[in-house]
Every structure is written in structure tokens, then in C-alpha cells.
């Protein structure tokens, strides 16, 4: 079995560093790079792109609300036309830096509050995904399980890599538990490893309430800002390899 292992990276800003990106990039097959709105800046984007190219891992745009102070995790009420332009702006920024480095963007994902809102609202997901398709009809959408995003992508003939968030708790609708709720972020390496093993063995995840629900995933995501992210990534890799899995960049899984 082949599966992608990806992480959200490049989420520092200026002199401020977030996460251990260099170590994480040695362990993953695809990187989701902040594009300057919820985090990141041109120099961080450039160095992350060049490191991804050197390691041969897939490069993805991680687009979010214009909310540096809130790290893109606060809901914002923005006119839909403007929000679509914000998404395209971020895609263009990373694609430009990648082109200058002789590399390319293979996939994108919606960050934080924007991702949660789009996953739960077809009227929001449709226009946002359409904006992505207009930018690049070959772009892969990387998303946690979401009927809204998957149907929008299908309507635009875009491929979707459904993602399992190894360090986040799920509810019984297979949506992410809000971060403000106790237990929403999974930090224990053994617990993360067990969750990944369960996913690979029977395609399920145990929800915060203790119920098993089915999860369809081609990719496993780890947040770079989760405490102990490097140790968690090693645990995930070990679990995948222990189950006979092969870690593979998302574009190779979906034939980009």
C-alpha cells in the first residue's frame, strides 16, 4: 500500500520561527507551505521551496485567511469574491517562487478556519475550489474528508487527496473537533502511532467520543506546529512501514 505523509510547514514570519521544518522535511513526502497570509513570508517560502526541491518532495500551497495574529485559526466574514481572490493570490505567490526555483506546485490545501468552514459548507467550497481550478486545472486538492469539497472538486474535474489528520481528533461526522475542546490535539507519539495503525488496518478512526468511523485517506497529515512534531512524524513513518506501507508523494499517488 502506498500513502502520502505530509506536513504544514513554512509557518514562521520574519525573525520568528515556527516548528522544526528542516527535520520534518527529512521524514515526509509532501509539504504544505504557508503563503504569507496566515503565516510565512517571501524568504521563508523561498527557502522551503528550495529545500523541497532538493529533497524531491511534493510542494503544496497552504492557503488561509489574512490573519497573521490569529494564525488563520479565527473565522472571518469576507465577501466571497474577495475570498476567492485571496486564494488565487496565495497560489500565485507560491507558484511564482517555485517557478523561479525551477520547481512546481503540485497540490493545495485550505488552512485552519478557512478549511473548516469550506469543509462544512458547499456554498463556500464550490466557489473556492472553482477559483483553484481556474488557476491550475491540474492542481490536486488536499483535504480532510469533506463531501462539500469533494463534490466541488468533482464538478471542476480536480483530483482530491483525502487526508487523515494524525494529530487531530475527529467527531462522529468525521469532521475535526474544534481546537478549543480538550483532546482536540493529539500529542502523544504512541497514540498517534496507534491511530495511524488503525487507519491502515481497517480504514477507521476512533472519535473523541469513542466511536469508530470510516475514513478514506490517501494522505496522512501532521501539523508542523504541534508540540513534538518531529517525534510524531517518526512515529507515523514507523507505523506506516510496520504495516507494509510505502510513503509516496501525493502527485505520484494520483498520477500528476
From Swiss-Prot:
GO terms for molecular function: 5-oxoprolinase (ATP-hydrolyzing) activity; ATP binding. The keyword Hydrolase applies. NCBIfam families: PRK05406.1-3 (NF003814), PRK05406.1-5 (NF003816). Its EC number is 3.5.2.9. Forms a complex composed of PxpA, PxpB and PxpC. It catalyses: 5-oxo-L-proline + ATP + 2 H2O = L-glutamate + ADP + phosphate + H(+). This is 5-oxoprolinase subunit A 1. The lineage of its organism: Bacteria, Pseudomonadati, Pseudomonadota, Gammaproteobacteria, Pseudomonadales. The keyword Nucleotide-binding applies. Catalyzes the cleavage of 5-oxoproline to form L-glutamate coupled to the hydrolysis of ATP to ADP and inorganic phosphate. GO terms for biological process: carbohydrate metabolic process. Keywords: ATP-binding, Hydrolase, Nucleotide-binding. Coiled coil: none annotated. Belongs to the LamB/PxpA family. Pfam families: LamB_YcsF. InterPro entries: Glyco_hydro/deAcase_b/a-brl, LamB/YcsF/PxpA-like.
Amino acid at each position: 500500500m502506498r500513502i502520502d505523509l505530509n506536513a504544514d510547514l513554512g509557518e514562521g514570519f520574519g525573525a520568528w520561527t515556527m516548528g522544526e521544518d528542516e527535520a520534518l522535511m527529512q521524514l515526509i513526502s509532501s509539504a504544505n507551505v504557508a503563503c504569507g497570509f496566515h503565516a510565512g513570508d517571501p524568504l521563508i517560502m523561498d527557502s522551503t521551496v528550495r529545500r523541497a526541491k532538493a529533497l524531491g518532495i511534493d510542494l503544496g500551497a497552504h492557503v488561509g485567511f489574512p490573519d497573521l495574529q490569529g494564525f488563520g485559526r479565527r473565522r472571518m466574514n469576507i465577501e466571497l469574491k474577495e475570498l476567492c481572490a485571496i486564494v488565487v493570490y496565495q497560489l500565485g505567490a507560491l507558484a511564482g517562487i517555485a517557478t523561479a526555483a525551477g520547481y512546481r506546485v503540485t497540490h493545495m490545501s485550505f488552512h485552519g478556519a478557512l478549511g473548516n468552514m469550506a469543509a462544512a459548507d458547499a456554498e463556500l467550497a464550490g466557489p473556492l475550489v472553482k477559483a483553484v481550478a481556474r488557476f491550475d486545472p491540474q492542481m490536486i486538492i488536499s483535504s480532510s474528508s469533506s463531501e462539500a469539497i469533494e463534490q466541488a472538486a468533482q464538478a471542476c474535474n480536480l483530483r482530491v487527496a483525502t487526508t487523515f489528520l494524525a494529530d487531530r481528533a475527529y467527531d462522529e461526522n468525521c469532521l475535526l473537533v474544534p481546537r478549543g475542546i480538550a483532546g482536540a490535539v493529539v500529542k502523544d507519539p504512541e497514540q498517534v502511532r496507534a491511530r495511524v495503525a488503525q487507519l491502515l488496518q481497517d480504514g477507521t478512526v476512533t472519535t473523541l467520543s469513542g466511536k469508530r468511523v470510516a475514513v478514506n485517506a490517501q494522505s496522512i497529515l501532521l501539523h508542523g506546529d504541534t508540540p513534538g512534531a518531529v517525534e510524531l512524524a517518526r512515529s507515523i513513518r514507523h507505523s506506516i512501514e510496520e504495516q507494509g506501507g510505502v510513503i509516496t508523494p501525493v502527485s505520484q499517488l494520483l498520477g500528476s
